[in-house]
Amino acid sequence: ADPTSGFIKDNEAEFTYIQEQTGKQPAIRGIDFLTYHLDENGELSYQDYAAERAIEWTNKYGGIATICWHWSVPSSTGNYAFYVESANANYTDFSISKAVTEGTKEHEIIMKDIELVASKFQMLEDADVSVIFRPLHEAEGAWFWWGAEGPEPCVKLYRLLYDQLTNVYGLDNIIWEWTGYTTPNSAAWYPGDDVVDLIGYDKYNVSDGIPNPSAIASTFYGLVASTNGQKMVAMSENDAI
């Protein structure tokens, strides 16, 4: 298939606009591994060439690609989704607790998906492309399946994912980022200093539907303090800036 198809050009629209208006490309570009999950036939249901686009962009512009993964899993209704029922009409009731338990159908499903994304990261490594990877993002918000059952299974899944990609598949081109918060329960969600390189914060500061451009510096300083200043802190998503 042609990675320069119409769909791929749509993915480039915002970056083309920025280039046209400023003459420059952003130094960091976010790419989603959204389509990297296997269906009931063990195949990709859709392909948007995210890994290939990351390689092309970083090689062409010399920037840094940051990867998130809206990880779709099956629901008992037969569809694939990443939201829970309370968050979106297209939802999954997939159990993360079962997914981190060996011998379950859910565990088999996630291990096959991890194998798939490992092959994509290997593709990146073979092209000498290192990336920031931000898996299981916004877990504490509980609107995605990986945060729906509390911190313990989420931490287990993050550490499983880290172990598989780093130790089993031998990948060393990944900078690991965790989406942090500053609530009283945030420490319980933190996977651990040994498996996190960066702390990210997704800044959506909306009141009455209107984004607030406040820097909310106290939140970012709180994240710095949460790891005693040992981890860099990034704004990993944002509305107004």
Regions flagged by a language model, labelled:
Residues 1-2, 134-136, 140, 158-185, ...:
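Aromatic-lined carbohydrate-recognition surfaces of secreted/lumenal glycan-active proteins
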Residues 183-241:
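Glycoside hydrolase catalytic-domain groove-lining segments
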Residues 2-5, 34-37, 71-74, 137-141, ...:
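Solvent-exposed loop/turn segments at secondary-structure junctions
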